[in-house]
């Protein structure tokens, strides 16, 4: 058959062509083979509460035993334009971890235990190469790090819509559970409470429209700064341990909007504010490179990037030092970066 553009007129009967789904760009057999390839990755995440097999119309899971008044907590997110750079540089596994992290880190801010994760992947073809399999393997890794099951997902072939070779779009959905009496909602926060910042793994998954603009203008080469694509750190295990030891009053996942916009979301009422000392930690060098190459104002840097702080806790001053020591014992760097003040 002569190669044609998608919108060229074509009389199938006159040309003697029998149209099928594969000719239109979707190979059902390849899709079934892909499902078989990812089964081991998916099953490696399953918790004892998972019910049923793999590949059904839905996923089922029991609420773990021990909860008296369980409250379900849900969140959804993507990886933004970081996904485009990850595609270009073959970081498919890492972007899978990113996807889980962006959802899980949001869900745990109220004290929830992550239960299960769902993914949505849109790609031109599932059989072009191993990249979509690598992506799912990364998602499974993120789920194992989070302690949640990869309960299901959808991989859709969009041959006419995603014309760039190997490009894909992804979204994730996470559900967790928390005991109603143990919800961390910020209601106990008072002036003088301390803000502890926990190190990020670099840029994480926000600010990439600005970063990509710098790459388009040849000011930054990703090949010179591979740490730009480091996956977002997952804080679920750390937070799970800390909340058993210390009275955590509030938590924030530092994403788009940086510290100035995410920390105030912890505050329970009017009359309170956040005071941050930006000199209290050393920001990773990559942020200095971005600021210098783009001539970005400091205020803009603070509103766009995490600047090296990926997650924050608000604790009473009497447990500040012990909390910092405990975080260090888990292998993370952390600093007291500010406090709660009267507005």
What residue ranges belong to the model's regions?
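Acidic/polar, glycine-rich intrinsically disordered N-terminal extensions of enzymes
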Residues: 18-45
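Short, acidic (Asp/Glu-rich) active-site segment that either coordinates a divalent metal cofactor
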Residues: 180-225, 260
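A generic structural signal for residues located within well-ordered alpha-helices
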Residues: 26, 30, 95, 206, ...
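Glycine-/charge-enriched secondary-structure boundary and capping motifs
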Residues: 3-6, 12, 16-25, 130-149, ...
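Compositionally biased, low-complexity linear motifs
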Residues: 36-51, 265-278
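Glycine-rich phosphate/pyrophosphate-binding loop regions near the starts of catalytic domains
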Residues: 40-201
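Residue-level detector of flexible, active-site-proximal loop/helix-junction positions
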Residues: 35, 67, 80, 157, ...
């Amino acid at each position: 058959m002569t190669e044609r553009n998608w919108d060229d007129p074509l009389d199938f009967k006159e040309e003697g062509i029998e149209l099928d789904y594969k000719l239109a760009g979707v190979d059902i057999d390849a899709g079934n083979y892909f499902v078989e390839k990812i089964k081991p990755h998916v099953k490696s995440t399953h918790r004892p509460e998972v019910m049923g097999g793999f590949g059904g119309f839905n996923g089922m899971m029991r609420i773990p035993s021990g909860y008296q008044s369980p409250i379900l907590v849900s969140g959804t997110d993507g990886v933004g334009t970081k996904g485009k750079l990850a595609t270009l540089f073959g970081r498919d596994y890492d972007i899978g971890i990113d996807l889980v992290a962006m959802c899980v880190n949001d869900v745990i801010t109220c004290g929830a235990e992550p239960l299960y994760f769902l993914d949505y992947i849109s790609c031109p073809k599932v059989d072009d190469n191993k990249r979509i399999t690598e992506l799912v393997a990364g998602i499974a890794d993120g789920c194992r790090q989070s302690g949640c099951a990869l309960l299901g997902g959808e991989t859709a072939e969009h041959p006419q819509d995603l014309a760039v070779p190997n490009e894909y779009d992804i979204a994730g959905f996470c559900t967790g559970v928390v005991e109603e009496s143990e919800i961390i909602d910020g209601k106990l926060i008072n002036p003088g409470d301390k803000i502890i910042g926990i190190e990020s793994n670099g840029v994480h998954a926000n600010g990439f429209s600005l970063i990509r603009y710098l790459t388009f203008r040849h000011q930054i080469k990703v090949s010179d700064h591979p740490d730009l694509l480091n996956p977002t750190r997952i804080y679920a295990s750390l937070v799970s341990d800390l909340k058993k030891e210390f009275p955590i009053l509030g938590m924030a996942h530092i994403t788009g909007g940086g510290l100035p916009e995410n920390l105030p979301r912890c505050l329970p009422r009017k009359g309170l504010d956040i005071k941050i000392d930006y000199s209290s930690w050393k920001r990773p060098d990559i942020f200095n490179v971005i600021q210098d190459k783009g001539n970005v104002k400091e205020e803009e840097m603070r509103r766009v990037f995490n600047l090296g702080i990926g997650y924050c806790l608000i604790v009473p001053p009497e447990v500040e030092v012990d909390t910092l020591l405990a975080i260090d014992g888990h292998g993370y760097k952390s600093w007291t970066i500010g406090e709660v003040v009267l507005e």
